Amino acid sequence: MKRKWEATLKQIEERASHYERKPLSSVYRPRLSKPEEPPSIWKLFHRQTQAFNFVKSCKQEVHVFALECKVGDGQRIYLVTTYTQLWFYYKSRRNLLHCYEVIPENAVCKLYFDLEFNKLANPGADGKKMVALLIEHVCKALQEFYTVNCSAEDVLNLDSSTEEKFSRHLIFQLHDVAFKDNIHVGNFVRKILQPAFHLIASEDEDMTPETTGHEFTHFSETPSEQGTCFSKMSTDIDVGESQTSNSEKLGRLGSAQQSSPDLSFLIVKNDMGEKRLFVDLGVYTRNRNFRLYKSSKIGKYVALEVAEDNKFFPIQSKNISKENQYFLSSLVSNVRFSDALRILTCDVPQSKQRVQCFSRTGTSVEAIEGFQCSPYPEIDQFVLSLVNKNGIKGGIRRWNYFFPEELLVYDICKYRWCENIGRAHRSNNIMILVDLKNEVWYQKCHDPVCKAENFKSDCFPLPAEVCLLSLLKEGEEFTTDTTADTETKSPHGPSSSVLSKGAFSDADWDNGIDDTYILEATEDAELAEAAENSLLAYNRMDEIPDELLIEVLQE
């Protein structure tokens, strides 16, 4: 009896020691003593589009993250939560450590890079030196094309290298500067790496280089023929002057190409011995999944950590830990609007064509000068109605979308009436800001005096027909109608059993699969629903769930 008791006591002591080393995670509950903590929102979705629709209907600032489910099948479920709540659980729950930020389509974002090469295929490559040279080259390009000053101290350098592969993520922390979206980031990166493309082409005449990510396959146009233009955000000149500015940038680009920098250090070999770039150019696609700080790929054991040669150190805050600050800095789409923020663009010719959707008369509008519709064309039309009155025909020069705040910022041209001074500015343009979460719009302007006063007009309600819930409802009705039509025309489409297997590649998930087919798979969302229900139940309980106890005991 005594031996049995001693064995039981020893087992209890071992468990107590285990829990001291690995304590059970508590439940996230915002506290009144910390008003900065957002309410609890933790919702899982089987489809990415459902997750984004929920974000748009949510009044809180929430974000979409992708969680890998199983090794090898490429399937992911999508989590919607706040940065604060994700970090609360992320610190202690292993099942969250295969997590990706979903960089929203059209959203303002940071400049970022994904770097990798096979060490065995490149025995002489010095990864750290290559990273330093790349950062130096990018900083020079930012200064030359956008007059943006930065250095290695403004670059968060994350490492997930193994004995076989060198792997880094670079996220630039530019001061009051961001890119219009990650497509513009990709255009900029491809442009500044042109000398490396040409070098590969000259070394192998049988290969036409292209920058599709992991391999070189096709790059049909020279830099001058491609006509990509660089322009910084001009907020106090009208369209004609903006065109001149762009021409000057192109001239500088041409002169820079005549004395191309040596980018031979960027050329590496894959495991087949084929030449490719050190920079992965496949990470600049819409709704891109980009691995989070401290996450590893599922089935792998090396997470993204701060690199030994990292020179970026976040500003210390008494309310936020250093690790949390690194986490927030690593988020590519974590950019907030401010009057001082400059938005950088890098367009290709296709996006410089005049776009009919902005025209209220059915003809192209010169004032728009080719900027495409925002994600909400109905709101574009509403904004145009605000600046087309009293005989003045204003236009939208450009728009920028801030995903965290669901804020659309429209730069207006040919309409300068300012509520602050009660008349039109003589030379400075205005902005119309549409707050989609709060369903209001207001005016700010680029005039230095108004900026110094931090002027913001009164808020005015959006018409009901352009509010997000109304637009989402219309979108759902359209999708339903389209699905019904597709089912009529294609009765032999793929079955839900086939679609529910989840054997999709990363590329499939990144590029998106036709919603009309995936709608059938919603019946097979038990995985997401079960996970969601368990998490919701977990958040409601004060006691520790049995499932969590079992999981901890088995580790």
From Swiss-Prot:
Catalyses: ssDNA + n NTP = ssDNA/pppN(pN)n-1 hybrid + (n-1) diphosphate; DNA(n) + a 2'-deoxyribonucleoside 5'-triphosphate = DNA(n+1) + diphosphate
**Motif RPA1-binding motif 2: which residue numbers?**
543-551
For the region Interaction with RPA1, what residue ranges are annotated? 480-555
Please give the coiled-coil regions recorded for this protein: 1-22
Q: How does it assemble?
A: Interacts with RPA1; leading to recruitment to chromatin and stimulate DNA primase activity. Interacts with SSBP1. Interacts with POLDIP2; leading to enhance DNA polymerase activity.
Family (UniProt): Belongs to the eukaryotic-type primase small subunit family.
Q: What is this protein called?
A: DNA-directed primase/polymerase protein
Q: What is the lineage of its organism?
A: Eukaryota, Metazoa, Chordata, Craniata, Vertebrata
